[in-house]
Amino acid sequence: MSHLALKDLFSGFFVIDDEEEVEVPDKQQQVNEAPAKEQSQQTTKQNAIKSVPQKSASRYTTTSEERNNRMSNYSKNNSRNVVTMNNATPNNASQESSKMCLFEPRVFSDTQDIADELKNRRATLVNLQRIDKVSAKRIIDFLSGTVYAIGGDIQRVGTDIFLCTPDNVEVAGSITDHIENVEHSFD
């Protein structure tokens, strides 16, 4: 609809056609009609207010006893969904933690395979004796980040040999101190 068509539509509401007669009431009639109009407007307003639906108080009101009863039923229903970790089969866990992978990377790209084994929760022993020092440092930095991300640990167990363990493997003792003591005793 165009702008002019809308204008014509609305102007028809407010304009009185020439054919209609308009009576101008006397002042006396206006004074008598004014209180009647006010009274009818007030009645209309009151009826409009009465027509607004009232909220049912009983629908929203609950006692604390009902609320507690609902919460206890809710917690009872949800307790069936809880699985305790003690019920996990110990054989599967021991098989995962009992496997150790040995790696001797030749290039930095071999580090991805080591990280994959760590993500699969397997301990890895990494021998960096056959790689240049710069690449060895990059590999250790990468593996340190991987071990940190999975919550594991990395330990030096020999010259350029590192043990990387995931969170399900615990290493007791330390070989590094013993190796350093042995090296100093040969001097």
Curated annotation (Swiss-Prot):
Residues 21-97 are annotated as: Disordered. InterPro entries: Cell_div_SepF, Cell_div_SepF/SepF-rel, SepF-like_sf. It comes from the Bacteria. One of its GO terms (biological process) is FtsZ-dependent cytokinesis. It is found in: Cytoplasm. Residues 38-63, 70-97 have a biased composition (Polar residues). Keywords: Cell cycle, Cell division, Cytoplasm, Septation. GO terms for cellular component: cytoplasm. Pfam families: SepF (PF04472). Cell division protein that is part of the divisome complex and is recruited early to the Z-ring. Probably stimulates Z-ring formation, perhaps through the cross-linking of FtsZ protofilaments. Its function overlaps with FtsA. Homodimer. Interacts with FtsZ. Belongs to the SepF family. This is Cell division protein SepF. The gene is sepF.
